[in-house]
Regions:
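Thiamine diphosphate
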Residues: 1-206
Length: 206
């Protein structure tokens, strides 16, 4: 059997979180449950992340909980490409088997009981995580590094491209406000608290 392996290597050293027990099969499929938010009936979001930005997504979950009382379920997505391949295969099968019970894609299966809007953040352009939009049935927001490349510290670059923990938190709060689950004043308060300039140029334009 001929097998081809590939590895994506990032230029950042950090301690990788421990793999959740029983997640091996889902990791291979491209999406796995990393950590569930707390229980309760308050606002809840689903946070998806991949690569080095997943650390910012984890930090955003803590900000949402501690600063705004919002619970976040965390999902690791090591392969959005694998997720869209699976989804398209399921779409094709459902198209060709109209008299049988429709199958669910891996994304749909993982999120079928999830509550709240879904926010995805990656170190790639937004189109990367946009690929799975047809399989996300809740409101879906994608964050990515669209724009011209430049040199600076990781912290400043992630702020510039609007993919750091504060921008992930803001996107989650805005999605909750759009869904009517929190007041829009909360989003405005987050802009002030995290010193996010509403007149900041779009990274695509500078």
């Amino acid at each position: 059997e001929d097998i081809f392996y590939y590895l994506t290597v990032m230029n950042e050293n950090y301690e990788h979180p421990e793999m959740p027990a029983g997640s091996e099969a889902d990791i291979i499929k491209g999406m796995y449950s990393f950590r569930k938010g707390g229980k309760g009936k308050g606002p809840r979001v689903q946070l998806l992340g991949s690569g080095t930005i997943f650390r910012e997504v984890i930090a955003a979950a803590d900000l949402l909980k501690n600063d705004w009382g919002v619970q976040a379920d965390l999902w690791g997505c090591p392969s959005f490409n694998e997720l869209v391949r699976n989804g398209q295969n399921v779409q094709r099968w459902n198209l060709l088997h109209p008299l049988e019970a429709p199958k669910l894609s891996h994304v749909e299966e993982k999120l079928k009981d999830a509550k709240g809007p879904v926010i995805a953040a990656t170190d790639y352009i937004k189109l990367f995580s946009e690929q799975i939009r047809p399989f996300v049935k809740a409101p879906y927001v994608t964050l990515g590094t669209d724009g011209f490349g430049r040199s600076d510290t990781r912290e400043k670059l992630r702020h510039f491209f609007e993919v750091d923990r504060y921008w992930v938190t803001l996107a989650a709060l805005k999605a909750l406000a759009d869904s009517g689950e929190i007041k829009r004043e909360v989003v405005a308060a987050a802009l002030v608290k995290y010193k996010l300039d509403p007149n900041k140029p779009n990274p695509m334009s500078v």
